[in-house]
Each structure stands twice: as structure tokens, then as C-alpha cells.
């Protein structure tokens, strides 16, 4: 009875005012919560961006190329991790790798493509599109031969940019070289792209 009498004493407009106040408080709480989530996500993205920039800057120095925002960052980051790995015939790991093993590992990681086990087969079986030397793009496979006829492929690498490519040298392991060097100009045979390569 006391509760009923108390409610009778409260004017009707007080309930409307109270309801309006609670609505404003609820709106304010939702706004604060949304801002907190947005700030948290923005901070996380900012930290991730800084980390990416640092990793790309390191990869750029290691590969000797300038990496732009439009480049395939995953390609350059992956290749940078292989520089300095020792040569090992038939190897397919960072403990040791040969030229076709290097292209196999990088393509499998980046494109989910399993290339053939040697450079000759990669050109004959895996390449779907031949590319002229002046039109190579980052990620294209490059093929070389030390034979006079150049019919037998015995070396393969991956093009980066600016004339640079990554490959596994028998004497110096995984390294970066320039296509304009006389040695590589003499050995050049072809370039190509596989069906699984994405830009």
C-alpha cells in the first residue's frame, strides 16, 4: 500500500523525464564503448602497419631493391628470408637449398603451387606463359644455361625488380644478382609464369 501511495504522489511527467534521462545515459554508454573499440582497433592496425614497414625496410636492404606500396610485399618478405641460406644439392629447406628447390619453396609458400623438381622441368612443365626479358615482372621464373646451344636448362631464379633476381648459387648460396651482369646476360635463356602466380 505504501508503494502504491508513493507512486501516486509522483507526477506523470517525472516518469517521462526519468525515461528520457536513462535513454541519454544508455546512448552515452554505447558511444563510449564504440569509441573504445574503434580506438583499440586503430591502435592495433597502426602497430601492425609500423611492423610491416620495418619488415619491408629490412627486406629492401637485404634484397637491394626499392619496395613500393603497390608491390607484392609477400614476395619480397618471403625472398628476404632466404638470402644467405647455404647451397645444398636437392635441398628444400633453410638448412640448405639448390636453385630449383628455392623456387619450389617460395612458390609453394606464396602461391600454393608445387613446381617440378628441377629447372628444366619447371620450364617445360610448369611455365604456362613465356615472357620476354624486357617484360618480366616480380615473381617471374628466370631460366639460364651454361651450354652453348642453350637447349639444356641448368639454373633457375625468381625475378624481383630493377633487374635484380634471387637464386641459389652453388658456390655462394642464396643471393641476389643483376640480370645486366655479363655472366647472366650470356647465360640467359627465358622467363615465364605459372598458372598459379598472382600479382
Give, region by region, the residue ranges found by the protein language model.
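Post-signal-peptide N-terminal segment of Sec-exported extracytoplasmic proteins
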Residues: 48, 54-95
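Catalytic cysteine-centered active-site loop
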Residues: 62-66, 85-138, 189
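C-terminal motif of bacterial Sec signal peptides marking the signal peptidase cleavage site
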Residues: 37-40
Amino acid at each position: 500500500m505504501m508503494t502504491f501511495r508513493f507512486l501516486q504522489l509522483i507526477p506523470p511527467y517525472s516518469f517521462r523525464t526519468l525515461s528520457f534521462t536513462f535513454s541519454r545515459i544508455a546512448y552515452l554508454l554505447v558511444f563510449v564503448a564504440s569509441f573504445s573499440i574503434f580506438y583499440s582497433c586503430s591502435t592495433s592496425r597502426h602497430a601492425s602497419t609500423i611492423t610491416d614497414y620495418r619488415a619491408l625496410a629490412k627486406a629492401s636492404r637485404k634484397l637491394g631493391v626499392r619496395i613500393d606500396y603497390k608491390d607484392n610485399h609477400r614476395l619480397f618478405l618471403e625472398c628476404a628470408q632466404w638470402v644467405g641460406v647455404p647451397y645444398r644439392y636437392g635441398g628444400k629447406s633453410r638448412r640448405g637449398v639448390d636453385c630449383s628447390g628455392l623456387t619450389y619453396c617460395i612458390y609453394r609458400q606464396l602461391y600454393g603451387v608445387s613446381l617440378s623438381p628441377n629447372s628444366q622441368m619447371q620450364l617445360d612443365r610448369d611455365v604456362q606463359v613465356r615472357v620476354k626479358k624486357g617484360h618480366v615482372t616480380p615473381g617471374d621464373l628466370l631460366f639460364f644455361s651454361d651450354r652453348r646451344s642453350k637447349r639444356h636448362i641448368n639454373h633457375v631464379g625468381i625475378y624481383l625488380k630493377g633487374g635484380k633476381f634471387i637464386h641459389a648459387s652453388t658456390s655462394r648460396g642464396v643471393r641476389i644478382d643483376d640480370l645486366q651482369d655479363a655472366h647472366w646476360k650470356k647465360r640467359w635463356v627465358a622467363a615465364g609464369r605459372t598458372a598459379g602466380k598472382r600479382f
